Amino acid sequence: MVIRGRAPLRVSFGGGGTDVAPFCEEQGGAIIGSTINKYAYCSIVPREDDQIIVHSLDFDMTVKYNVRENYVYDGRLDLVTAALNAMEIKKGCEVYLQCDAPPGSGLGTSSTVMVALLTAMARWKGVELDGYAMADLAYKVEREDLKIDGGYQD
């Protein structure tokens, strides 16, 4: 069985930066943007052991976790570590990640990868998250848990 998550990248036409605190909290914000037909992908293949093996195809990197240990941020695929913690994943699996655009492209890649990850994990766990709940969770994980700067549009 393969569980998949996919999320579209986005382009901002104007207003970028007005969605970043504290500006948006004090002044409000408005952005004109759209998703595009480029995506971040996540595939999860359950395993029968206690290992989580993550393959980042874009970074040509593999990271392993043991579900019996705490998932610790170590600078290697911390987006995945944060998603595992947020979704409380405690079953073995292989995770495959790929994105149609490179990090730093200005298309919201890290947030898009996070949404693809969380979508696949939620499907695997049988957790229903509507678009707003998914956006809130992805924002919390990236901005609050990982302390990654960015706005709401990401």
Question: Which residue stretches match the model-derived regions?
Answer:
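Alpha/beta catalytic cores of group-transfer enzymes, especially the acyltransferase/condensing modules
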Residues: L129-D154
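Active-site signature of alpha/beta-hydrolase-fold catalytic machinery across serine-
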Residues: A116
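ATP-binding N-lobe of GHMP and related small-molecule kinases
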Residues: M1-L107, T119-G131
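Short, conserved phosphate/pyrophosphate- and ester-handling motifs at nucleotide-, phospho-/glycolipid
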Residues: S110
